[in-house]
């Protein structure tokens, strides 16, 4: 936002220097990013009169001039052609330094002496471009600095506004901030419109078909205008804020835009079919040519302004070529409307068309200032273009927008800011900001927010206003205060930490992957079409299709991480993730979010070394990880079975984990097709445990059994057992006898081959016996051992070898 010092002083009285004003604005949160002084240091550029002009003897395009500055007559060589004898001009005398650090010196030009320079607006920094030198009003006194004589000395501030401060996109808005800080009032211009006897209802009609996108539309009709150049004061003021002059009518709309911050648009009323304005959405594929000469293809989401036959403007963004103000324009329909910010933002972004108008509408305009801005523009057009304003204003406002009221607590504000202001002091701040304070209780307010402050929505926004107006530099330095909670972690939290420690202790690294996945990735996992994990939760606004649904398994994320690392030649990996998955819940809108532990192992078992053989990890490595977890959680009576397995496991190389009737999880080698689907060319082993079920069956009380100080003894049993019988059932059968003297039973040999019948396998079990009371002797161990043998033969139909 660009604003000038003098323009601000028209709306608020202050005695601050430009530098002091710059500091004040910055402390208010309106950061001044640049300051430019106009006319400063140009006192040597004075008003002079051309007494004589003649042709340069040595150059066709140069003139010899005799110029009087009120003290003396000087010889000047000039190349401009737009002046004559008797004109008053801006004379840069010897020693003057013009913008761009251009110093005026006595010189000879084509053999003729020149004691100064006649200046153009561009050379004085008054315009970006100019033709010829500046011709001054005839009533200006000679010898007076030009900028003093014209009242052009000014300071231009370039202010960087945050997107929420739409109220400061105007001179009035910034003046309101200055007045609030200084405790003074804004001198609002109350436009007075001299109306003709012709009612506007006889000249124009407005129909709003979509009041959601255009809640309010106002208009005035001005007849008999003469289109021409704007007066110098208006041109210079627009140029000071970075706008170029077009004609007196368009310049007025731009002037009011910068003054009040509300966009206006002027239509050539004679080009509006039927004298009608219709506000409605565009038709899909509709083509419309805007003022910049570009043809735009519109959609049904774009709001247009139409007459009785065609589109004449892209609402809130840019007018149309077919209704613009021309040199021949006589009658004008002036628009002042409020458009839905989201609709303007969407259309502007889609078309790549950003204008001063759309910049303000998409941030939120002031719906209450429409008529004020409209009347201000109408009175200026009548003054500068000689128009006659029709009686009355069209104001279509079927459903007034609701007012915002925000509850405010004085003690909460003091606590958050670390200050000690009274309720009266805070109320005074809000009153200076033109907020209405309704006192509910001595330290409880209901604040009515002005329509211009679209950024005020919650109590914390009001707290910020107190901080700004009271001064950030007035907030005392205090140590931060926070409540310290000493609650102990819950059982689940302790178990989560324990599980992470177990995994890290076994050489795993924790990874964190996205909670989103691509729906098509479930096909890569070979899941059946009726698998519940295909019932995914879809995101309403995904960034990309690859992250458009919530994950129902942790496996894809781990495989993506593994594939990426393997591509970088990190061939040995142990990774785990303890995170939630999102599974459908029958009869409920929201999914279940169980916590799962998933891990993968691939590569070699041990790091390479001269004393280590290079063995690849296998099924028993991942099984060992599972057993270690079960031991840490004190979970007994676990059975490993080769059923209830997911299709992404390799057949015959995976197990499910059962504890009673609860399925705790599964583990094993992944199917070769899974490797191919994820671009992995080595075996990967996977484990998946349901943390909630682990926690449910785990025990917090672990029985401590002191070691026996007596020696053990062992006996071996070699037996034949059917192939389909898991070897683990032998150990389970022995444990089920609950013989106190049996310390452990371990399988130490597994054999299939010669001397073993087809359909059988040879298993050898070593049973260790030990007593805590004495050393066991053979006649005590033998009957115990025989009991075990008999039970195995009877229950498992084994053949003792």
From Swiss-Prot:
tRNA-binding recorded as keyword: yes
Annotated positions binding Mg(2+): 455, 461, 464-465
Reactions that this protein is recorded to catalyse: tRNA(Phe) + L-phenylalanine + ATP = L-phenylalanyl-tRNA(Phe) + AMP + diphosphate + H(+)
Domain B5: 401-477
Gene Ontology biological process terms from the UniProt entry: phenylalanyl-tRNA aminoacylation
GO cellular component: phenylalanine-tRNA ligase complex
Alphabetized GO MF terms: ATP binding; magnesium ion binding; phenylalanine-tRNA ligase activity; tRNA binding
Ranges where the FDX-ACB domain occurs: 708-801
Keywords, alphabetical: Aminoacyl-tRNA synthetase, ATP-binding, Cytoplasm, Ligase, Magnesium, Metal-binding, Nucleotide-binding, Protein biosynthesis, RNA-binding, tRNA-binding
Record's cofactor remark: Binds 2 magnesium ions per tetramer.
UniProt cofactor(s): Mg(2+)
Pfam families noted in UniProt: B3_4, B5, FDX-ACB, tRNA_bind, tRNA_synthFbeta
Primary site of residence: cytoplasm
Family, as annotated: Belongs to the phenylalanyl-tRNA synthetase beta subunit family. Type 1 subfamily.
Name of the protein described by the UniProt record: Phenylalanine--tRNA ligase beta subunit
């Amino acid at each position: 936002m660009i604003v000038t010092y003098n323009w601000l002083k028209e709306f608020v009285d202050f005695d601050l220097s430009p530098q002091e004003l710059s500091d004040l604005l910055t402390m208010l949160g309106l950061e001044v990013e640049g300051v430019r002084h106009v006319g400063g240091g140009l006192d040597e550029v004075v008003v002079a009169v051309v007494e004589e002009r003649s042709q340069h003897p040595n150059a066709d395009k140069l003139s010899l001039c005799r110029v009087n500055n009120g003290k003396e007559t000087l010889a000047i060589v000039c190349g401009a052609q737009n002046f004559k004898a008797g004109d008053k001009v801006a004379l840069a005398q010897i020693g003057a330094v013009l913008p761009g650090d251009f110093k005026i010196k006595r010189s000879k030009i084509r053999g003729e002496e020149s004691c100064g320079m006649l200046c153009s607006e561009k050379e004085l920094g008054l315009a970006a471009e100019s033709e010829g030198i500046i011709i001054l009003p005839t009533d200006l006194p000679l010898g007076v600095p030009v900028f003093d004589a014209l009242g052009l000395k000014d300071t231009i501030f370039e202010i960087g506004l945050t997107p929420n401060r739409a109220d400061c996109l105007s001179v009035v808005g910034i003046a309101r901030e200055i007045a609030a800080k200084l405790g003074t009032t804004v001198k609002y211009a109350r436009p007075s419109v001299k109306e003709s006897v012709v009612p506007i209802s006889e000249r124009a009609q407005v129909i709003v078909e979509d009041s959601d996108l255009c809640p309010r539309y106002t208009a005035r009709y001005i007849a008999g205008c003469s289109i021409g150049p704007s007066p110098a004061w208006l041109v210079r003021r627009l140029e000071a804020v970075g706008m170029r002059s077009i004609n007196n009518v368009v310049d007025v709309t731009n002037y009011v835009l910068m003054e009040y911050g509300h966009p206006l648009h002027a239509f050539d009323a004679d080009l509006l079919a039927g004298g009608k304005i219709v506000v409605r959405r565009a038709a899909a594929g509709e083509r419309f040519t805007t003022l910049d000469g570009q043809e735009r293809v519109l959609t049904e989401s774009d709001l247009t302004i139409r007459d009785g036959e065609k589109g004449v403007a892209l609402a809130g963004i840019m007018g149309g070529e077919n209704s613009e103000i021309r040199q021949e324009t006589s009658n004008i329909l002036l628009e002042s409307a409020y458009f839905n910010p989201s609709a303007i933002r969407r259309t502007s972004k889609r078309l790549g068309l950003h204008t001063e108008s759309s910049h303000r509408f998409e941030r939120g305009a002031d719906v209450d200032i429409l008529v004020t801005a409209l009347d201000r523009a109408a009175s200026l057009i009548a003054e500068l273009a000689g128009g006659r304003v029709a009686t009355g204003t069209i104001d279509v406002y079927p459903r007034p927008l609701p007012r915002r009221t925000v509850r405010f607590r004085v003690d909460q504000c003091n606590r958050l800011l670390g200050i000690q202001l009274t309720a009266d002091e805070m109320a005074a701040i809000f009153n200076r900001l033109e907020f209405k304070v309704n006192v509910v209780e001595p330290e409880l307010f209901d604040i009515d927010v002005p329509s211009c402050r679209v950024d005020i929505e919650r109590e914390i926004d009001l707290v910020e206003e107190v901080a700004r107006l009271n001064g950030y530099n007035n907030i005392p330095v205090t140590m931060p205060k926070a409540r310290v909670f000493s609650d102990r972690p819950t059982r689940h939290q302790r178990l989560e930490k324990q599980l992470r420690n177990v995994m890290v202790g076994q050489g795993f690294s924790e990874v964190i992957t996205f909670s989103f996945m691509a729906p098509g990735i479930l096909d890569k996992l070979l899941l059946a079409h009726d698998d519940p994990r295909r019932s995914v939760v879809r995101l309403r606004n995904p960034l990309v299709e690859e992250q458009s649904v919530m994950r129902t398994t942790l496996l894809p994320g781990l495989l993506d991480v593994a594939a990426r690392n393997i591509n970088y030649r990190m061939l040995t990996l142990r990774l785990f993730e303890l995170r939630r998955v999102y599974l459908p819940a029958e009869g409920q809108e929201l999914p279940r979010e169980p916590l799962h532990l998933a891990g993968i192992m691939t590569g070699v078992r041990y790091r390479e070394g001269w004393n280590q053989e290079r063995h690849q990890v296998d099924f028993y490595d991942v099984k060992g990880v599972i057993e270690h977890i079960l031991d840490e959680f004190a979970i007994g009576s676990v059975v490993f079975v080769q059923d209830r397995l997911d299709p992404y496991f390799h057949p015959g190389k995976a197990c499910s984990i059962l504890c009673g009737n609860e399925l705790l999880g599964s583990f094993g080698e992944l199917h070769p097709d899974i490797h191919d689907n994820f671009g992995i060319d080595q075996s990967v082993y996977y484990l998946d445990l349901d943390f909630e079920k682990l926690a449910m069956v785990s025990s917090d009380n672990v029985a401590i059994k002191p070691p026996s100080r007596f020696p053990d003894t062992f006996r071996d049993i070699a037996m034949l057992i059917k192939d389909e019988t898991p070897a683990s059932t032998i150990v389970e059968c022995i444990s089920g006898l609950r013989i106190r003297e049996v310390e452990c039973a371990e399988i130490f040999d597994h054999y299939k081959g010669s001397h073993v019948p087809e359909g059988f396998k040879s298993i050898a079990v070593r049973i260790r016996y030990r007593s805590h009371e004495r050393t066991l002797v053979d006649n005590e161990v033998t009957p115990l051992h025989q009991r075990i043998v008999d039970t195995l033969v009877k229950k498992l139909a084994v053949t003792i070898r």
